[in-house]
Amino acid sequence: MRNCRTSTNEIDLYVQWTEIARLTHLQIAFPYFGDSFLCECKNYGEPVGVTYVGKFCSLLLCSNVSLGVMISWNGVTGRGKWDASKGLIKKFALKENRYIVVLDKNDLKQLSRKETNIFSLIGNKVQALKLDIDYSTYLKSHPAESEFARSGEK
């Protein structure tokens, strides 16, 4: 559906599997899409700022979907991985277990040249985001853990 509205927001695209796709379990092959996802299109001359990314985060929450695709020719703001809009996208993923992927001019050019397809592109970006926020490799056992474990047995 295009440009549908909630009571407070407009949704550019609400994408869901067709009945045939659901009956053939196509969504199992692409689990990162869930049953549906939102798509936000921003045609700005500059990267999308943190305010609009924050509004998109809010829209994902109130729509109860776990994937959002933001299409922005110039991407989103942030000099480093954890700065501005890029940082908000990662923090949102960590806290809410919901993912926003950004498709920029490079991605759109790849799609138009048929160097990739939309399923692979979005899937790779979701996977990259998940790996980027995974902190488990940095967790090491603390020497006092065994003491806590023993005191819990009493």
Kindly label every feature range from the protein language model.
Residues M1-K154:
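Mixed-charge (Asp/Glu-Lys/Arg
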